[in-house]
A protein has these predicted regions:
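Conserved active-site "lid/cap" helical segment
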Residues: 1-82
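Residue-level detector of alpha-helix boundaries and kinks
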Residues: 9, 48, 52, 86, ...
Length: 166
C-alpha cells in the first residue's frame, strides 16, 4: 500500500497539505495501482535521469507486449502495419518509442511513424484521431496506436507541488 510511503514523504509539510494529499490518494477509487517501479523505488532519492532510464526500459517492454498481443488478437503480423503512432507523455526518449518498436518487432522500414509526446492527457485521443485521419485518406492501410503512460517515473521526491503528485 502506498499510503504509508506518502505519509512518510509528507513529514514536515503543513497539515492542510497532508489532508489534501491523503484525500486525493484515498478518494481516488483506485483499489490496485500498477507501476513500472516498486513503491520503494518511487520514493527513493533518485534523479530524473535515473527514473527516465527506468521509464525507457519499461515503456519499451510494455509497448512491445501490448502491440504483440493486439496484433495476435487481430491475426496480423508486425510487418502488416503501415502507420505506427506511439503516445507517451511521461518520459523522454530519443529515438522515440516507435523506433524501438519498429526495430525490435522487425516492422517495415518504410512504415509511417508518428510519436505523440508532450501533449498531456489529450495525447491518447489525439493519437486515435491521427490514426483515423490516416485511414480515411488510405482506406486499405493498417494503423497501430500504442500508448504507454508511467507517471510514477516522473515523481520527484523533493517536489511537493500538486503537479508532481497528480
Amino acid at each position: 500500500d502506498i499510503i504509508p510511503y506518502v505519509k512518510n514523504w509528507m513529514r514536515g509539510q503543513d497539515n492542510r497539505f497532508k489532508r489534501k494529499v491523503l484525500k486525493l490518494f484515498k478518494g481516488s477509487g483506485v483499489k490496485r495501482r500498477y507501476s513500472i517501479m516498486d513503491v520503494e523505488e518511487v520514493f527513493s532519492k533518485s534523479s530524473f535521469e535515473e527514473k527516465n532510464n527506468i521509464y525507457i526500459h519499461e515503456a519499451t517492454k510494455l509497448a512491445e507486449q501490448s502491440l504483440k498481443k493486439s496484433l495476435k488478437k487481430a491475426n496480423l503480423l508486425p510487418s502488416d502495419i503501415d502507420y505506427i503512432i506511439t503516445v507517451s507523455c511521461t518520459g523522454f526518449m530519443i529515438p522515440s518509442l516507435d523506433a524501438y518498436l519498429i526495430n525490435n518487432l522487425q516492422m517495415k522500414q518504410d512504415i509511417v511513424r508518428l510519436p505523440v509526446t508532450e501533449m498531456g492527457c489529450v495525447a491518447g485521443v489525439s493519437g486515435i484521431i491521427y490514426g483515423k485521419n490516416f485511414l480515411n485518406a488510405n482506406p486499405n492501410k493498417r494503423v497501430a496506436v500504442v500508448s504507454v503512460e508511467a507517471p510514477t517515473a516522473t515523481f520527484q521526491l523533493d517536489n511537493f507541488s500538486m503537479d508532481n503528485i497528480a
